[in-house]
């Protein structure tokens, strides 16, 4: 099975390659061990999955046809076409680590960033519920149920705004 690591663009190494670059602006891609991507792509097996992953081992592309890939700046590995490997996708939630396709392991910083995004989304949702209820109260058009809902959502909004995203504990959303 093929595994080409850290593929980068580089200079042509033969006269033929130089002529192709000169005549057609061909960009040559080389793995860290000096293998030519355009030659190696022919050696991938047709019945395997080809996975492209970044410097953090995060899967960024998956295909059965290696010739469709532009792996510049990435690594490409060939893995068996089995259920365990087919479950992966290029959503950023999967990794190629220690020779296997695994669910992504997030760093503490990434987890905090995800919590920040979730916090912003929850606050936005709360505001979208609160605004029309506030308007109904301000215009003396609110029912008792709307006043109760407004208070519940405002309390929820305050609790969400106080969540420590380094160690999030999310409050229960009002009904």
Curated annotation (Swiss-Prot):
Provide the induction entry: Expressed alternatively with tail fiber assembly protein U'. The switch from S-U to S'-U' is performed through inversion of a DNA segment called C by the phage invertase protein Cin.
Query: What biological-process terms (Gene Ontology) are attached?
Result: symbiont entry into host cell; viral tropism switching; virion attachment to host cell; virus tail fiber assembly
Q: Does the keyword Chaperone apply?
A: yes
Q: Would I find Transcription regulation among this entry's keywords?
A: no
Quote the cellular component terms of the Gene Ontology held in the record: host cell cytoplasm; virion component
This chain's function reads: Chaperone involved in tail fiber assembly. Expressed alternatively with tail fiber assembly protein U'. Remains associated to the tail fiber and participates in the host receptor binding. Two alternate tail fiber assembly proteins U and U' are encoded extending the host range of the virus.
Protein family: Belongs to the tfa family.
Query: What protein name applies here?
Result: Tail fiber assembly protein U
Instruction: Tell me what organism the protein belongs to.
Output: Escherichia phage P1 (Bacteriophage P1)
**Record lineage:** Viruses, Duplodnaviria, Heunggongvirae, Uroviricota, Caudoviricetes
